[in-house]
Each structure stands twice: as C-alpha cells, then as structure tokens.
Regions:
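ATP/adenylate-binding site constellation spanning eukaryotic-like Ser/Thr protein kinases
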Residues: 9, 46, 66-69
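Hydrophobic anchor at the start of a short beta-strand
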Residues: 29
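Acidic, metal-coordinating helix/loop segments flanking the phosphotransfer/catalytic sites
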Residues: 36-42
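Structural micro-motif
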Residues: 45-53
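Non-catalytic, surface beta->alpha helical segment in thiol-disulfide oxidoreductase systems
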Residues: 56-78
Length: 78
C-alpha cells in the first residue's frame, strides 16, 4: 500500500482543501510542516505547499503540487 505524505503549513487555504479532500475519501496520510522538518522537505524536493508525495516503498510515484483533485484521485487510486 502506498504511503502518502502531505507537506503543509498553518494558515494555508489550499493545504486545508487537500486535507478535506483526503479526509472525505477516508485516505490515511502523514502531515509534515516543511519549516519544522526541513530535512524531509529537502529529501522530497518540496519547494511549496501544499505538496503531496505518494510513495511506493522509497520510490516517489506521484508528486502533486497545489490542490488538484483530479491528480489526487489518480494518485491515490493506484
């Protein structure tokens, strides 16, 4: 099963939209603030929030930047 990591920061409206979307679909995910954990932001090449990373093992299968429901749907349904 894929591991989903959502990079977000406080007071970010698109970040809240991504969270609401994933919660509505009952999808489990981890939330990371790239300012609190910059080493993970560097590891996953996160430059802006929200960024959703879908991992298969250690391999990045999908990277979604911003709130893009169609891309999220594709990424989490694989």
């Amino acid at each position: 099963m894929a591991r989903i990591i959502k990079f977000e920061k406080n007071d970010c409206a698109p970040c809240a939209q991504v969270s609401a979307y994933l919660d509505n679909k009952d999808i489990s995910y981890e939330t990371i603030n790239p300012f609190d954990e910059p080493e993970l932001a560097v590891k996953f090449k996160v430059r802006t929030v929200p960024t959703v990373i879908v991992l298969d093992g250690e391999e990045v299968k999908h990277r979604i930047i911003g709130f893009k429901p169609e891309e999220l749907e594709t990424a989490v349904s694989e």
